[in-house]
């Protein structure tokens, strides 16, 4: 998939919503626990209910790895289900990988060749040679952690050098000099929306994956105001506020309602920018 194809889907669906599949077996509706694979059953219902309103799904690997091989199987089957039933959806594996070159080669092979996801979140801490194996896959995107929404982002990401440049700004700026930098996206938390204007000066054209809207309290309006570019350039993720909106047998309908409400807000933002 190209960024143009992604933008076309955003315009067609009037949405830049990414639904995060942070599925915790302890939080899903009790009636699903009788299923052979409760996690997969929950995910299928959420996917079916929200696919109309979003352009991407982002399963978070940690929630599946916590259940060992059973969870890994649920993760893989979830991706297969999206691919088969909703092939126009952009799939982001939220795994936050990143290691020396040989290890990154294996991570890239696992997610891009075996699982066939469209994008993978990656930590940039080890530098260019830890990222280049991911960028070698044409049509696949590497989503670098840049400025995250957690309180601990202040510990390192917001450190300034002698010239006043934040560490996260340096990460973004230098990564843009790497080969195949057009395949980079960046994680920027919605709770850091005040920094989006400065980030756009460094990467005016890149897509930003923005978690933190919804349960974490980030403002969709602020994100759209300061982060949207001429090709939208945003994938705003919501997880808990959608998938755990209800814990009864009507959970999927409630999730659909939450996703639809966000889609309506996104349509307003896209129209305000003249993109649709």
From Swiss-Prot:
Coiled-coil residue windows: none
Molecular function terms, GO-annotated: orotidine-5'-phosphate decarboxylase activity
Catalysis: reaction(s): orotidine 5'-phosphate + H(+) = UMP + CO2
Annotated catalytic residues: 96
UniProt keyword terms in alphabetical order: Decarboxylase, Lyase, Pyrimidine biosynthesis
Family classification: Belongs to the OMP decarboxylase family. Type 2 subfamily.
Protein's recorded name: Orotidine 5'-phosphate decarboxylase
Organism phylogeny: Bacteria, Pseudomonadati, Bacteroidota, Bacteroidia, Bacteroidales
The gene coding this protein: pyrF
